[in-house]
Amino acid sequence: MKRLLSTLLIGIMLLTFAPSAFAKQDGKRTSELAHEAKSAVLIERDTGKVLYNKNSNERLAPASMTKIMTMLLIMEALDKGKIKMSDKVRTSEHAASMGGSQIFLEPGEEMTVKEMLKGIAIASGNDASVAMAEFISGSEEEFVKKMNKKAKELGLKNTSFKNPTGLTEEGHYSSAYDMAIMAKELLKYESITKFTGTYEDYLRENTDKKFWLVNTNRLIKFYPGVDGVKTGYTGEAKYCLTASAKKGNMRAIAVVFGASTPKERNAQVTKMLDFAFSQYETHPLYKRNQTVAKVKVKKGKQKFIELTTSEPISILTKKGEDMNDVKKEIKMKDNISAPIQKGQELGTLVLKKDGEVLAESPVAAKEDMKKAGFITFLKRTMGDWTKFK
């Protein structure tokens, strides 16, 4: 059982949250947002609130939107220091043999992680995706295991990966909702939009094989605020897109599966984004990695450890509603004791209004904490004993 560490009234002016505002859709207007797609979903990034959905849990071929998970695992490896942007990645014969969209890597060719990430995010390179999979995990098969493990960690119930590219393969599927959650997780790493939000760039500059990259997501150029995330197309999947756009404090993620043409795909995503920004607004409360509390640690080298947010935390409301305040609660896990690793989840931050939960998000250790040595532990025990003497 979890115990309540603290309850703090946040004296901030926020718009009133009404659960029915998100459960009820605005009739005819929302029914026409993605009427040509097989499935679609619209969420707000910080809160994950679903603003619109159409068959969003249907299992369908995701095509190259698969690379959202591929990029997520790359960004995680970078964040944990397992790889660096400057690392050289050598292309295997297997990676170079990938068909479909590619950056035409040759066996033995080397590019940096940064260059490979450009090739994946901008040009949807299948060869670059497999090269990075092999670089991180040793083989494509081991990387796919990581992809499915991460999907399970994120609670995705309608996703199964067979490759890191999205090329058609039996048993390879996802859903609009699951894809939106993957994009939500990827966008925690804000630097990813430097890649996904770039419309054109070059690889192999200053060589006779200079290669022009043009983003397959045309909305980056034509819809203000769009900076990601990934398109997809195969004969089975048809035209797909997971798009992200930011306006003011609000970031929306719109996903479309199975549109008949690129024009139709972009039009439906545009309608969803327009709807999100015209009807809702986001109120940021915490940035990612912001310190929110500290907790006592048993047997630690230090007595207390600071807790930080694991993602941006905001409240989403309909526009024009009344203002009110919000309560913050931090529910800690029982028996927190050293050793503790940086980033280890130690509790949950809960935001409530009038008893209704508005948002929940994990809080994690700000830094590593080793177990106290014998001398430290003895001094602390003696100090505690003298206090009660």
UniProtKB/Swiss-Prot annotation:
InterPro entries membership: Beta-lactam/transpept-like (IPR012338), Peniciliin-bd_prot_C_sf (IPR015956), Peptidase_S11 (IPR018044), Peptidase_S11_C (IPR012907), Peptidase_S11_C_sf (IPR037167), Peptidase_S11_N (IPR001967)
Pathway stated in the Swiss-Prot or TrEMBL entry: Cell wall biogenesis; peptidoglycan biosynthesis
Keywords on record: Carboxypeptidase, Cell shape, Cell wall biogenesis/degradation, Hydrolase, Peptidoglycan synthesis, Protease, Secreted, Signal
Transmembrane segments: none
UniProt-listed Enzyme Commission number(s): 3.4.16.4
Location, primary (coarse class): secreted
GO biological process: cell wall organization; peptidoglycan biosynthetic process; proteolysis; regulation of cell shape
Cellular location(s): Secreted
Signal peptide range in chain numbering: 1-23
Alphabetized GO MF terms: serine-type D-Ala-D-Ala carboxypeptidase activity
Family annotation (Pfam families): PBP5_C, Peptidase_S11
Reaction catalyzed: Preferential cleavage: (Ac)2-L-Lys-D-Ala-|-D-Ala. Also transpeptidation of peptidyl-alanyl moieties that are N-acyl substituents of D-alanine
Family indicated by similarity: Belongs to the peptidase S11 family.
Function statement: Removes C-terminal D-alanyl residues from sugar-peptide cell wall precursors.
Identification of the protein by name: D-alanyl-D-alanine carboxypeptidase DacF
Gene: dacF
